[in-house]
Structures are given as C-alpha cells and as structure tokens.
C-alpha cells in the first residue's frame, strides 16, 4: 500500500480553507477514487480547564484559544502518526465546540475507520515557523505591549512553535 499523503493548508480565518478542503475531497474521490480525511488544528485546542491552568501558571493570554501553545500537541502528533501508520487501526479525531469554548464529547468526534490516501490538515497556523530571538524584542501590537510587557506569552508561543509544532509539521 502507498503511504498516506498529508496536505497542510493554511490561511486566515474565513478565507475558505474548509470549503476548498471539502471541494478537494470530492474531486479526489470522484476523479481518482482516493479516500480523504479532513481535520482542523482548531479541533485540537486544549480543554478550557487546561487553558485556565496555563493562564494561571504562565500567562493569562493562554486562556484565549488560538495561538500556538493552546493546542494539545501530543494528541495532534499521535493523530497524524496514526493516520500514517502502515498497520492502520481505527481511532477518533477530536472535535472542538467553539460555542462552549471546549472540546466536544467523544460521541461527536470524527471516527476514522480505514486508512486514508490523503489527509488535509488545515488551520491558520499550520506550517508556521518560529521567530528569531531578535524579532521578539519589540511588541508587535497593543495587546503585547499592554498584556505581555515582560514577553512571557510571546516567548512561550515561539518556544512551542520551535519545539512541538515543528515536530508535527515535519511529519
């Protein structure tokens, strides 16, 4: 069997990542008979409770989901590894419910029953790379200037990208 191909799709909020992913899925199935799984990095946000703990321990900015560091990178890494395994086993991909700002119950998760040919992994920060230390010196906006004047949040986000996200994006 051929290896599962991973396509990383990045773009800003509302730019059509999900729409183009679904169109690609239809084309790949109808024209080539390929099974495609689509999921978003958004579905891997840490739980509200996990982010509350981070906001108390590290920076209150981690309470708001979105930035690198607010995703469950261990779960995401395992998910991509599972999708690529030669000896495929059924598993589930989490779903995040933005209306409750928390992970959905497991009965809402995406059930993956067979090895896909293609995986489309989409999100606004998919493929992002860490910044150089010199680029972290000055705040880039009012939020960082006021709420992160010691640069704790920004440095932690960058460290997460450098260590955990890079490992995922290199799969």
Positions of the model-derived regions?
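Extreme N-terminal, non-catalytic leader segments
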Residues: 1-8, 12
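ATP-dependent NMP and nucleoside kinases share a basic, alpha-helical "lid"
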Residues: 103-171
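Glycine-rich, phosphate-binding/catalytic loops in enzymes
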Residues: 26-27, 55-57, 135-139
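Conserved nucleotide-sensing/catalytic segment adjacent to the nucleotide-binding pocket
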Residues: 37-40, 44-101
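Post-Walker A helix-loop "phosphate-sensing" segment adjacent to the P-loop in P-loop NTPases
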Residues: 26-37
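Conserved lysine of the Walker
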Residues: 17
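Hydrophobic positions on the alpha1 helix immediately C-terminal to the Walker A/P-loop
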Residues: 20, 24
């Amino acid at each position: 069997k051929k290896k599962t191909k991973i396509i990383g799709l990045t773009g800003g909020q509302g730019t059509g990542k999900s729409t183009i992913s679904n169109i690609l899925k239809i084309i790949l199935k109808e024209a080539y008979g390929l099974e495609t799984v689509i999921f978003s990095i958004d579905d891997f946000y840490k739980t509200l409770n996990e982010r509350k703990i981070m906001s108390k321990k590290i920076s209150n900015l981690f309470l708001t989901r979105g930035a690198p560091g607010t995703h469950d990178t261990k779960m995401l890494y395992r998910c991509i590894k599972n999708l690529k395994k030669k000896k495929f086993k059924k598993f589930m991909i989490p779903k995040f419910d933005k209306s409750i700002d928390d992970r959905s119950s497991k009965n809402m998760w995406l059930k993956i029953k067979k090895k896909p040919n293609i995986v489309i992994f989409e999100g606004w920060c998919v493929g992002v790379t860490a910044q150089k230390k010199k680029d972290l010196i000055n705040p880039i906006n009012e939020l960082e200037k006021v709420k992160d004047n010691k640069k704790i949040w920004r440095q932690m986000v960058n460290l997460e990208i450098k260590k955990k996200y890079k490992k995922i994006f290199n799969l």
